[in-house]
C-alpha cells in the first residue's frame, strides 16, 4: 500500500535516486520548470504534477463589519513530517494578524503558540503540536485569527468589495449579516448559516489558487438558516491503488475527519467499500483502532470522545477490494466505478498510459505511475467514472 501522507519524503528520495543528473543540471543551470511569469507576463512552465492529492487544508474567511477592513479566519492545516513538534503558519505581507487562538482538533483544548516577526513585513504563528508527529501519523491544529488588510477589504460607497488570491485549499467565505451578494467570480455552493449569514463554499478542481472578487450590498431580506452540508469542508480523500488489471484487485486508502459527537466513529464508507484486510488508524497518534461490528454497521471506539465543535477524529481506513469492473478489454485497461466524496485519485499500474477519462480530472505521475485526480464539485456525493489506459511498449 502506498502511503499518501509520506508522499513528499518518498518523492524526494526517489527523485534523488533516479535522476541525480537532473539535480546536477539544475544546480549548474537555470530551473527548467520555475513556474510564475516572464517579464512580459507570459507563463513559465511548472514541474509535472506528482502529488496524489491537493487541498488538504481548509480555510474559512468571515468578512467582518463594513469599514473594519478585517476578516476572521478559521484555518485547519496539517504537518506530515514525522517527528515535527510545531506547525508554522505565516501571515501574508500587508495583513495584520490579531486575536489568535490555536486548538488541538483531537481534544478541543488550547495549544501554546507564538506570533513572531519573520522580517520583510511577514509574521508567523508557531503552534506547538500536542505531540511530535508520529511515524505514519499526521499533525494538525485549528487556528482562528483576524486579519486587517485594506487591500483585500474595501468599500465602494455602501457596498463591500473583497478581493484576495486564495491558496489552493478547500475554502469558505461568509458575508456580514444583513448583506447579500451582488456578484462572485468563482463557482461556489451558496448557503445560509445558523445565524443568518450567507456563505460561499468552493475549491479549485485543479488545486491552483483562486483569485476571488466579491461584491456585496446591504439587504432587508431575511435568510433563514439551512442545513445544507458544506461539501468543501468535508476533507475525505480516497486513493485507489490499482493492481494488475487481470486480477481486478484494488488497494484502497481513505483518510477523513469525523466531527460527529460521541465516543465511537461509524465507518460509513464500508457500505460502498467492501474491504478485506481492513485496518483503521487514528492519524493523530498513528494507533491502530479495533473495528467493532454492530449488525451491518462497523465502528471504532475513540480514545478521546468528541464533545464540542472544535473536535474531530482524524482516521485512515485501508484495505483491499476486488472489483469485476476493473479489467482488461481488448488489450485496454478499464476502471469503471462509482466514486464517493470530494477527492478521489486513481493510481494506475506501472507501464500503463491514460487513454480516456469520463469525468474532469487532472493527470500526473507518481513514482513512475500515471494517476488521475478527481474533485467532485457537485452536491451529490457520488458519481460514475470510467478510466481507460493502454500499455506502453
Predicted regions and their residues:
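Beta-strand elements of well-folded, non-transmembrane domains
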Residues: 65-69, 75-83, 145-151, 177, ...
Amino acid at each position: 500500500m502506498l502511503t499518501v501522507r509520506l508522499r513528499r519524503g518518498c518523492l524526494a528520495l526517489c527523485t534523488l535516486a533516479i535522476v541525480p543528473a537532473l539535480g546536477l543540471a539544475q544546480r549548474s543551470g537555470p530551473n527548467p520548470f520555475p513556474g510564475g511569469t516572464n517579464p512580459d507576463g507570459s507563463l513559465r512552465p511548472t514541474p509535472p504534477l506528482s502529488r496524489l492529492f491537493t487541498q488538504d487544508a481548509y480555510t474559512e474567511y468571515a468578512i467582518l463589519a463594513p469599514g473594519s477592513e478585517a476578516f476572521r479566519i478559521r484555518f485547519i492545516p496539517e504537518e506530515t513530517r514525522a517527528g515535527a513538534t510545531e506547525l508554522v503558519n505565516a501571515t501574508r505581507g500587508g495583513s495584520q494578524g490579531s486575536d489568535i487562538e490555536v486548538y488541538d482538533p483531537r481534544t478541543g483544548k488550547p495549544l501554546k503558540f507564538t506570533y513572531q516577526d519573520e522580517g520583510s513585513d511577514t509574521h508567523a504563528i508557531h503552534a506547538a503540536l500536542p505531540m511530535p508527529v508520529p511515524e505514519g501519523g499526521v499533525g494538525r491544529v485549528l487556528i482562528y485569527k483576524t486579519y486587517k488588510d485594506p487591500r483585500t477589504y474595501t468599500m465602494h460607497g455602501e457596498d463591500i468589495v473583497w478581493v484576495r488570491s486564495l491558496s489552493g485549499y478547500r475554502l469558505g467565505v461568509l458575508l456580514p449579516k444583513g448583506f447579500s451578494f451582488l456578484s462572485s467570480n468563482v463557482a461556489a455552493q451558496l448557503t445560509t448559516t445558523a445565524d443568518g449569514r450567507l456563505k460561499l463554499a468552493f475549491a479549485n478542481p485543479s488545486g491552483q489558487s483562486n483569485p476571488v472578487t466579491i461584491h456585496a450590498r446591504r439587504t432587508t431580506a431575511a435568510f433563514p438558516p439551512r442545513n445544507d452540508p458544506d461539501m468543501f469542508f468535508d476533507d475525505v480523500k480516497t486513493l485507489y491503488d490499482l493492481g494488475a488489471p487481470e486480477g481486478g484487485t484494488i488497494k484502497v486508502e481513505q483518510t477523513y475527519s469525523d466531527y460527529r459527537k460521541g465516543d465511537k466513529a461509524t465507518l460509513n464508507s464500508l457500505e460502498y467499500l467492501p474491504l478485506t484486510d481492513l485496518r483503521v488508524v487514528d492519524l493523530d497518534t498513528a494507533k491502530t483502532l479495533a473495528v467493532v461490528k454492530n449488525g451491518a454497521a462497523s465502528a471504532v471506539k475513540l480514545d478521546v470522545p468528541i464533545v464540542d465543535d472544535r473536535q474531530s477524529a482524524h482516521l485512515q481506513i485501508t484495505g483491499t477490494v476486488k472489483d469485476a469492473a476493473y479489467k482488461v478489454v481488448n488489450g485496454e485497461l478499464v476502471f469503471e466505478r462509482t466514486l464517493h466524496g470530494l477527492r478521489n485519485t486513481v493510481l494506475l499500474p506501472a507501464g500503463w498510459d491514460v487513454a480516456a477519462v469520463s469525468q474532469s480530472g487532472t493527470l500526473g505521475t507518481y513514482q513512475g505511475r500515471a494517476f488521475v485526480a478527481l474533485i467532485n464539485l457537485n452536491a451529490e456525493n457520488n458519481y460514475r467514472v470510467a478510466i481507460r489506459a493502454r500499455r506502453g511498449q
